[in-house]
């Protein structure tokens, strides 16, 4: 049955109706920007317990708990309003709201980015509802409205948009992206908000109720495809994994092994496939086992360093998911930056699920199927 669905999705791609390709640019991460300005050490010192705190079971009215996107590198363009105003966003499968800075925001972070001006859009409607997004280092305050949102060739005339009126400065001031477009399930969206992809499905704006992601290691070449699967981005066959909780794109991982020995997730664990998180995050004790197995040593502020000269002798870390093994070689789980190497694994005891971020997605082309509530994975080209 899944093979038939794949054929339908590929056929839809060939017909190009209701198919949207959004090129993703691999840009400079916030970590790199802070490092270039000599600010990274102070940032890590002050926020070492909030670097990847994105996922939480706490829910409040019109609020979510998001990461500070310290290592996020993949961004795309969208347009809001009539006439359209351009924004660079993170297409984030780990959250569900769309928000961008507004002209009502005077924070330094907002002033450094594109800001939406409702007075210059003839289609904007104020909802008279507030939005609060809590970060580990402060909160983003905003308001909600409706407006036309354009993603490539898809025009959604009545989309909920969050407009920030206050942003935590040390989080977003130097980021290359303006805002976030969430692609998780509607149960994660703030009150009164409908996720962008849900609106597209409801209005039959996409050929299939799925989207797929390819993340290149190069600056160009990454792609988000709405409504189709593109076999030119992977080799072999897609393998399908049931979504266990329809909030995040969450599923069961059977185990994590190194050299055939279980080092983490013994007996199974829950994981989230998240395009808005760069690292591969898990419970502190499990991640510590992995760091030891790969020979990483802890730095001053919680990061784990690797000797760049040892990459060829380091082991492969294998995730077994739904009975299939997904190897991550050292080239995948090691971040190399200006002669320094760090581990792509990060411990976070505040998260109840593992988070498989860009470190994993660069290795495996990923399909997010809302029609069947499945995740598809195949070896990326």
Curated annotation (Swiss-Prot):
Span of the signal peptide: 1-16
Keyword Signal (UniProt): yes
EC number, UniProt record: 3.4.23.4
Keyword check for Protease: yes
Catalytic activity: Broad specificity similar to that of pepsin A. Clots milk by cleavage of a single 104-Ser-Phe-|-Met-Ala-107 bond in kappa-chain of casein
Keywords of the record: Aspartyl protease, Digestion, Disulfide bond, Hydrolase, Protease, Repeat, Signal, Zymogen
pH effect on activity, per entry: Optimum pH is about 2.5.
Gene Ontology terms for molecular function: aspartic-type endopeptidase activity
Disulfide bond sites: 105-110, 265-269, 308-341
Propeptide: 17-58
Residues in Peptidase A1 domain copies: 74-378
Entry's family note: Belongs to the peptidase A1 family.
Oligomeric and partner information: Monomer.
Descriptive protein name: Chymosin
């Amino acid at each position: 049955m899944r093979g038939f669905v794949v054929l339908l999705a590929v056929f839809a791609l060939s017909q190009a109706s209701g198919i949207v390709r959004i090129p993703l640019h691999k840009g400079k991460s916030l970590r790199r920007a802070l490092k270039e300005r000599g600010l990274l050490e102070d940032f890590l010192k002050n926020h070492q317990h909030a670097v990847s705190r994105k996922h939480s079971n706490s829910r409040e009215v019109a609020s979510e708990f998001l990461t500070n996107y310290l290592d996020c590198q993949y961004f795309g363009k969208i347009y809001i309003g009539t006439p359209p105003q351009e924004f660079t966003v993170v297409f984030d499968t780990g959250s569900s709201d769309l928000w961008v800075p507004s002209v009502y925001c005077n924070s330094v972070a907002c002033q450094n980015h594109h800001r939406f001006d409702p007075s210059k859009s003839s289609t904007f409607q104020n909802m008279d509802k507030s939005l609060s997004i809590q970060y580990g280092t402060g909160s983003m305050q905003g308001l909600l409205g409706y407006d036309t949102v354009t993603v490539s060739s898809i025009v959604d005339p009545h989309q909920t948009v969050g407009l920030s009126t206050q942003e935590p400065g040390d989080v977003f001031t130097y980021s290359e992206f303006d805002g976030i477009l969430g692609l998780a399930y509607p149960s994660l969206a703030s009150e009164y908000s409908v996720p962008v992809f849900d609106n597209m499905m409801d209005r039959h704006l996409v050929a299939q109720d799925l989207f797929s992601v390819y993340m290149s290691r190069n600056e160009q070449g990454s792609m988000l495809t709405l409504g189709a699967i593109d076999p030119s981005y992977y080799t072999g066959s897609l393998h399908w994994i049931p979504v266990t909780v329809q909030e995040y794109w969450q599923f069961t991982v059977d185990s994590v092994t190194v050299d055939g020995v279980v080092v983490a997730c013994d007996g199974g664990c829950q994981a989230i496939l998240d395009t808005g998180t760069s690292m591969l995050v898990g419970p502190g004790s499990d991640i510590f086992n992995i760091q030891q197995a790969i020979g990483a040593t802890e730095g001053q502020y919680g990061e784990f360093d690797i000797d760049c000269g040892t990459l060829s002798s380091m082991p492969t870390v294998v995730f077994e998911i739904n009975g299939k093994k997904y190897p991550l070689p050292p080239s995948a789980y090691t971040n190399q930056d200006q002669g320094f190497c760090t581990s792509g694994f990060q411990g976070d005891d505040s998260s109840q699920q593992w988070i498989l971020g860009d470190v994993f997605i660069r290795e495996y082309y990923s399909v997010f199927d809302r029609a069947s509530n499945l995740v598809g994975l195949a070896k990326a080209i």
